[in-house]
């Protein structure tokens, strides 16, 4: 719980001006998750928190290590990182996935976001960055050599398989099921969390994908083949035609975020068309398609950041 000063005896919906002290409190809880420090309180108490001084204080606070709270608090809420622990990969299929790896994946995303804030990077680098932050456990999982110890450090990728947020294990695990990837969940997550355009719920009576046959003609079906059977229902096709290509472009990442080329012994077919018609078949192509239309990404991020700062929806 946290307690903040608010003016009393206000009518619902009535606009009012925050005092400098109240503004300082809101700013500090937003950026640091703590009450204001002595410098900010002193300036606020003297009534000197003008627009120019407010900007100076904001920059000072963002440069302070306490602003890492934005990574652990805001990024965690916005990206739903808590879901990383809700549906663990099945140990019968993925015995190397454990609590330490899950924690490292979450920490990677928190540090990645905080680095963009600290270095005042473009928000779009959140998706295009050719680097990330790993410790030895996570580097080994990603196949990145030369990293030892529990300390997280910045590393540069050697190819374009992983780029930015969509190549990070946290997102790939929380959008998977325990025993298989889910292009539907991954596509839905991108639409809902990153683009701010959640698809409608499925119509009643439509069977789950897991109820679709897994074997045909004596061979195991890939997730894509089962999805094609599933969305043959015209009621489902309108939404799935938008979600599925997004998720399929990420299907080279397995349940734990490791890179793969086959599923059930069959080569993966990840080809699809982004909602604007752009062909996408790899994570890099998906990122390029998203960045080709950056306004929805920026608008949705801004709305989520404002909601976090205000403590309410906007």
Which role fits each region the language model picked out?
Residues 313:
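Short basic-aromatic helix/loop recognition motifs at nucleic-acid
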